[in-house]
Amino acid sequence: MDLSALASSREVRGPGPGAPVNRPLLPLLLLLLLLPLPASAWYKHVASPRYHTVGRASGLLMGLRRSPYLWRRALGGAAGPLVGLPGQMARSALLLPSPGQELWEVRSRSSPAGLPVHATRSLRDLEGAGQPEQSLSFQSWTSAEPAARAFGETLRAQPWFLQQIIFADPVRLDDRLKNRWRPRA
């Protein structure tokens, strides 16, 4: 077989050693156009780096420390400028309890059985304790006001989605037609 005859044929066999290689580059260039432009980090517009809402553990720390805006608002205008205060007083003025710290204190004040321990009773509680016949009367058991007050207190302690369930229409499964068992014919 003559190789010179094959080389002189006009068939397209692919680029030779000196041909430009632009066909594989075209998809790569198109792929680069599809990539997004470099942007700043997603949290930059949320908070500045000195706050606890930025960083690796920000999701864990957000509930533990209050925002500086909250403690400034809690101090109010009554505290005045903090520049004139001595060092120890200025530090104690800025350390307001966070909701996480308050929950921890409530939990640490509870008994080992999980029941809350109340520190001191008010004068009204002490007066009511001296009159057991009034607290055990039929009127106190059937009164709607303490029950409504207790329901409101427990309702406020529930998350919003449980509150929605409480106020939804109570429908028993027996009342719905589709839940009734029907023998098939």
Swiss-Prot record:
Residues 1-41 form the signal peptide. The keyword ATP-binding does not apply. GO terms for biological process: feeding behavior; G protein-coupled receptor signaling pathway; neuropeptide signaling pathway. Residues 74-185 form a propeptide. Keywords: Cleavage on pair of basic residues, Neuropeptide, Secreted, Signal. It is found in: Secreted. It comes from the Eukaryota. One of its GO terms (cellular component) is extracellular region. GO terms for molecular function: G protein-coupled receptor binding. The keyword Protein biosynthesis does not apply. Plays a regulatory role in the organization of neuroendocrine signals accessing the anterior pituitary gland. Stimulates water drinking and food intake. May play a role in the hypothalamic response to stress. When injected into the lateral cerebroventricle, it elevates prolactin (PRL) and corticosterone and lowers growth hormone (GH) release. This is Neuropeptide W. It comes from Rattus norvegicus (Rat). The lineage of its organism: Eukaryota, Metazoa, Chordata, Craniata, Vertebrata.
